[in-house]
């Protein structure tokens, strides 16, 4: 049938870890541990969605971070420096990721509703496999079990913003057309991934990296603060090319109904 057959979901900030805090804090700690260089949480969020080595590389190219690095070492960050930070990052992330494995509010019910419609649940992440091998069973213990998952270092072709992890889900799940898939993500590289794979794309403006608040902080925010943060996040996701932007995964079934109507009219992503 000419309808959505699969969703491919990001992990941190999309299905688990409201606000995407597990990776951001670890980047700050890894820079400090490896080279005694300080970066801010806001800086750590800028390249979110990329593979973690590529994320560190992108952080080193941020003008403010590069200026700090040059002031300390008299040069810009090298590949060997990135390797050293990544080596510090990995054990920290592996140790901490299980603490951020609880599904975001509404995720379990949404997954059940999608499966009731015959929709398969794929997933992929900017986390490497060593981290995912800890996160996946921890999330399963909380009730979140996608039908398939792909880590950023699984494929020789690479990770985001390329289409390969999303397309690997298409293959593994046996989906007949990429136009029958929706890629859901809270960061721009994941939206680019979906677009490059020829899929419909949905950005999440509140639950993830661009909004950047814990669940508790979000619950106590004023309506005005929520609106400002939501608009900031949505503008970035729309600028990346998202077909739709909603607050969280709980809003996805309504979006899929809208996409199904467009598919029935012959539209494509």
Swiss-Prot record:
GO molecular function, one term: phosphoglycolate phosphatase activity
Enzyme category, top tier: hydrolase
Named cofactor requirement(s): Mg(2+)
InterPro entries hit by this protein: HAD-like_hydrolase_sf (IPR050155), HAD-like_sf (IPR036412), HAD-SF_hydro_IA (IPR006439), HAD_sf (IPR023214), PGP-like_dom2 (IPR023198), Phosphonoacetald_hydro (IPR006323)
Residues at the catalytic site: 10, 52
Pfam families: Hydrolase (PF00702)
Cofactor comment: Binds 1 Mg(2+) ion per subunit.
Induction: Induced when inorganic phosphate is limiting; this is controlled by PhoB.
Record text on subunit structure and interactions: Homodimer.
Protein's job: Involved in phosphonate degradation.
Protein name (record): Phosphonoacetaldehyde hydrolase
